[in-house]
UniProtKB/Swiss-Prot annotation:
HAMAP family per UniProt: MurB
A GO MF term: UDP-N-acetylmuramate dehydrogenase activity
Cofactor(s) required, per the database record: FAD
Name of the protein: UDP-N-acetylenolpyruvoylglucosamine reductase
Catalytic activity from the UniProt record: UDP-N-acetyl-alpha-D-muramate + NADP(+) = UDP-N-acetyl-3-O-(1-carboxyvinyl)-alpha-D-glucosamine + NADPH + H(+)
Location of the FAD-binding PCMH-type domain: 31-208
Species of origin: Agathobacter rectalis (strain ATCC 33656 / DSM 3377 / JCM 17463 / KCTC 5835 / VPI 0990)
Higher taxonomy: Bacteria, Bacillati, Bacillota, Clostridia, Lachnospirales
Amino acid sequence: MNQTFVKSVTEQLPQLGLLQDEPMKKHTTFRIGGPADYYAEPDMSRISKLIEMAKACDMPVTVIGNGSNLLVGDKGIRGLVIGIGKGLSEIEVTEAVAQDFTAQDNCHIITAGAGAILAAVAAKAAEASLSGLEFASGIPGSVGGAVVMNAGAYGGEIKDVLIDATVLTADGELKTVTRDELDLSYRHSIVPEKGYIVLSARFRLTPKPKDEIKSYMAELRAKRVEKQPLEYPSAGSTFKRPEGYFAGKLIMDAGLRGYSVGDAQVSEKHCGFVVNKGEAAAADVLTLIKDVQETVLKQFGVKLEPEVKMIGEF
């Protein structure tokens, strides 16, 4: 235990609710992961101070969103883990004004905290009869995570509607970064390499009849239920889409449907997903991923790159 850090937090941020030895399986959709030394979900008023305290104690800081694209090692994460959650989950709809550089005819803006669930933002947009985020209606991740990885599905991506993001820099300064400056591409942004922490994002949307928006969103959700293994914990798509191929089909054609290591399994419903059938360990998932990569490379000459982010000690 880092007594200096705990004492500082207790005295200066008494309402924070700092947790010690917090199981990370409680904070990932994979339901896998060992303990974080310290875990907290600060709001906007506390996050900068908390990071400052951790740095003063030479403590590493890891920031996560909804944990929907993470595999945390069985030995957990050293230092402080900051969960961007309910304290940063506000969603606000406004109409763009003429002096706003984003303004277009009938353009509206949704501002969402990084902890807001992307699907909830899409639902809020639909209720306001605003189109552009339909593709996100079934994405379980947070706004912050979606910006970091330029989340997308069914032909839509965050970069299609993002205006800018407010971030906390590695120096502890608030900064607004435009979509172009974020250098968004397939499952990529400059956020990790710059050491930014996304605090909020603004999206540009356009009016459309509410029933049309909701009908299309319902159609996409039905496709997800039909094709994806939502009945089991997972981290979503395990591998990035290799150019010219589909990861799931390559894995299926390699004869790996249902392949298991412990309770980690290549989904029988969609081979692009690795699922946790019960008590899978991170080591099981890691071994399975490597086995799949080796088999697909050997059979088809295609190197699969993991989409799931691996953090912590394995």
